[in-house]
UniProtKB/Swiss-Prot annotation:
The gene is zitB. GO terms for biological process: zinc ion transmembrane transport. It comes from Yersinia pestis. Pfam families: Cation_efflux. Its main location: membrane. This is Zinc transporter ZitB. One of its GO terms (molecular function) is zinc ion transmembrane transporter activity. Keywords: Cell inner membrane, Cell membrane, Ion transport, Membrane, Transmembrane, Transmembrane helix, Transport, Zinc, Zinc transport. InterPro entries: Cation_efflux, Cation_efflux_CTD_sf, Cation_efflux_TMD_sf, CDF/SLC30A, Zn_transptr_ZitB.
């Protein structure tokens, strides 16, 4: 595992631990306050925070286990646990949204008495806690992995839930109109639904070993052929991501170089600096490529008839 990855994982672990402690404390506070005040918005927010605590715990454990070194049975290590945790958390958030909307519809047609003052006080406290947790998870300039982003989405959902509870409490205190409580619960749920669905698709794509969405494979192939003179064709490209690490295997049809290892290093350096691909296994070929995916920047066969296999 790269040193930068280790430092990133340690930073993520500290962020998640702080957010977990704060979220758990306010989850208990909101649950008690929601029960005493009769507020669905507060109970919904407490339910969110309960799942947030679970989500942050899952994310924290995923980071912890992902730091284990590779072994003969898990040659890539346990980095994919962070992606799996993100998928579970996104799926759980979708389920929570459905349950809250269901309860809100029921509460709208069967109104309950809501105590506005305790609801407002607890909602403000919850909002401050969620703002702090969201800041903790997002501070710093380094890119956050999908696991931390999934946990942050849970916190964001609670942050919006606290805002909704505050607005509902103010409306109830000033007008006595209690249907605002379930209405805002549904509104907050809808706001979260899109982000949760997008994160679910992204984590599922990564679990299926799909290529990172921001990388255009055809552009990458052309870039290598254009910027490295000896490279005439790139084919049999496979690109995927494990945790925060991008990996690639490819075949490169090249002009027989004077220094094989130097050319290999130039290809790998280009992939690292331009596409952040930290582990690339390159097989160089010195003869004509005749397979269907050899159509990009195809050149006439280079001199020489032998094939050299090189794996990092």
């Amino acid at each position: 595992m790269a040193v930068s990855t280790i430092f990133s994982q340690d930073s993520n672990s500290k962020r998640l631990l702080i957010a977990f402690a704060i979220t758990t404390l306010f989850m208990v506070t909101e649950a008690i306050g929601g029960w005493l005040s009769g507020s669905l918005a507060l109970l919904a927010d407490a339910g969110h925070m309960l799942t947030d605590s679970a989500a942050l715990f899952i994310a924290l454990m995923a980071v912890h286990f992902s730091q284990r070194k590779p072994d003969p049975r898990h040659t890539f290590g346990y980095l994919r646990l962070t992606t799996l945790a993100a998928f579970v958390n996104a799926a759980a958030l979708l389920l929570i949204v459905i349950l809250i909307v269901w309860e809100a519809v029921h509460r709208f047609f069967s109104p309950h008495e809501v105590m506005g003052t305790p609801m407002l006080i607890i909602a403000i406290a919850g909002l401050l806690a969620n703002i702090f947790c969201f800041w903790i998870l997002h501070k710093g300039e380094e890119e956050k992995n999908i696991n931390v982003r999934a946990a942050a989405l849970h916190v964001l959902s609670d942050l919006l839930g606290s805002v909704g509870a505050m607005i509902a409490a103010i409306v109830i205190l000033t007008t006595g109109w209690t249907p605002i409580d379930p209405i805002l619960s549904v509104l907050v749920s809808v706001l979260i639904l899109r982000s949760a669905w997008r994160l679910l698709k992204e984590s599922f794509h990564e679990l299926l070993e799909g290529a990172p969405q921001e990388i255009d494979i055809n552009k990458l192939r052309k870039d290598l052929c254009t910027n490295i003179y000896e490279v005439r064709n790139i084919h049999h490209v496979h690109l995927w991501q494990v945790g925060e690490q991008r990996l690639m295997t490819l075949h490169a049809q090249v002009i027989p170089p004077l220094d094989h290892d130097a050319l290999l290093q130039r290809i790998q350096d280009y992939l690292l600096h331009h596409y952040r691909i930290s582990h690339a296994t390159v097989q160089m070929e010195y003869q004509h490529c005749g397979t269907p995916d050899c159509g990009i920047n195809q050149a006439a066969p280079a001199d020489g008839h032998h094939r050299h296999h090189h794996h990092e």
